[in-house]
Amino acid sequence: MRLVRRQASALLLWAALFTSRGLFAQGILPPGDTVAAADQVKVALRPMELRYAQPQPILGPAPASIKALYVNAWAFGSSKLWQLVRLADETEINAFVVDVKDDTGCMLYPSAVPTAQEIGANACVRTKDARARLDTLVAHGIYPIARFVVAKDPLLAEHKPGWSVQHRDGGLWRDRIGMAWVDAYNDSVWIYAAQLAREAVKLGFQEVQFDYVRFPDEPRERLETAVFPARRPGQSQRDAVRAHITLLRDRLRPLGAPVTFDIFGLTASATGDLGIGQVWEDFIAVADVVLPMVYPSHYYRGAYGFARPNAEPYRVVRNALREALDRSRPRGSSAEIRPYLQAFTLGRRLPRYTPFEIREQIRAAEELGITSWVLWNPRSVYQRDSLRPKRRPSGPAQLSSGGE
């Protein structure tokens, strides 16, 4: 079995390197069809065919246990990526979760999806050589996962107001930090996300992950001013989320890539939908992987009986994941639970999250038999001492049998 996996990985690497031509090695662009992206590299904005993508995805085997870092688009598109690759080379990390469309609505790379081109999502791309960078990850044994933010997309909301949450007094509704949201009742919002995800898989990402698969979590008085134009009579927020995560799964399933969802950590504890449309049983019935965000700093005072949940990384994560496991078992769900763990300090909230607090969360998960996880730091800054060193093959005999 190990030999088969080694051969499959070698085939994936060979195919990726053989077919990689870079994003902009396809033809000559006429004058005036480029603009300066954020990194000051001239990037094509005209409608284009994704000729650097494959007609069919080339999928390799996923690691038996995924130990991943969240990598934001800026980090992926800059020299910081090489620092993170080196960190993975030297530690237990074997996967990166990369922002392909983040909560600004901007794309990681130029997209051929018509809606992305129409709304200007290609005007703020983060890298000009995504395919070459993906090839590098594959060469280093790093499993690439594409992350897509769905409902919090101010760029889409501004350019497609008919797809957006409206204010009862007119214009776009905005959250407490002034961000416009798209209407999670609207089918087109989710179809757009599915189109982008299919494109990413054909580019070389091995798995897709959807975040903000929900309605806004805002104070009641602000939500009372929100109007959702696409809501059907009698349709609840839960109905909309459940139908649309199924749509995402069905649109991606033919490509063979795992379909995964990030959800609130409290979803496994709640009896309702938290006012955002997320119910644990709905996700485990649809997803290949569910990723509850069990950050101790995000739990309310008194959660699980702790006055300061942020100061209890081991016990909060253990309680949260035990509830998730307990709710999944009666359903016989095959969905994997792969938690997001806190690798950041929230403001001035103490304690500061050092390698000790991070390892305590990992220990809590692993003691429950959950051996896959993702570390979240919004700046993609990680502490080496929070990670175990990479296990190396002990000798030629182990190498010849395929290694790990």
What does each model-found stretch correspond to?
Residues 95-100, 126-174, 207-211:
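Glycine-rich, aromatic-flanked loop segments that form ligand/cofactor-binding clefts
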